Amino acid sequence: MAKRVQLVLKEDILSLGKDGDVVEVAPGYARNFLLPHGKALPVTPAVMKQVEHRRAKQKEHEAALKDEALAFETALKTIGRFTVKKQVGDDGVLFGTVTNGDIAEAIEKATEKEIDRRTISVPEVHAIGQYKVQIKLHHEVTAEINLEVVSY
């Protein structure tokens, strides 16, 4: 049986690991795929030092993103309520529904900060009223806002 080779991954590879992980692979896989395609590097002290430096930078970056998300969550709570105007029938039922795009637009108008509509979790909204909406700002930070749907 052939000896396995240790490599440091330069990018996430689904079946192996994440960027910066030290993995053991078959020599042929390393020689024929990972090394020629630039997806990994052989383990050396210099490479390990680079990996540690990159991990420290990544950690700082993640902390900054989390702080930014927490600050935005506080701003959303300070505003309190966001209003979306929709056309309503005689019985109070909306023509159509309130989408995450509508909510993202209302948040952008109030905060002047762009938000990805895919991070917004909207309950079924088919009538005027007040609703709770979840927004995932960061993988560790979720904000809950009050949404008011009114007719125009």
UniProtKB/Swiss-Prot annotation:
Disulfide bonds: none
Pfam families the UniProt entry points to: Ribosomal_L9_C, Ribosomal_L9_N
Any one GO cellular component localisation term in the record: ribosome
GO biological process: translation
Entry keyword RNA-binding: yes
Keywords for the protein's UniProt record, in alphabetical order: Ribonucleoprotein, Ribosomal protein, RNA-binding, rRNA-binding
Domain of life: Bacteria
Cited InterPro entries: Ribosomal_bL9, Ribosomal_bL9/RNase_H1_N, Ribosomal_bL9_bac/chp, Ribosomal_bL9_C, Ribosomal_bL9_C_sf, Ribosomal_bL9_N, Ribosomal_bL9_N_sf
Gene Ontology molecular function: rRNA binding; structural constituent of ribosome
Key word Chloroplast present: no
Similarity annotation: Belongs to the bacterial ribosomal protein bL9 family.
The protein's role, per its UniProt record: Binds to the 23S rRNA.
The protein, known as: Large ribosomal subunit protein bL9
Gene this chain is encoded by: rplI
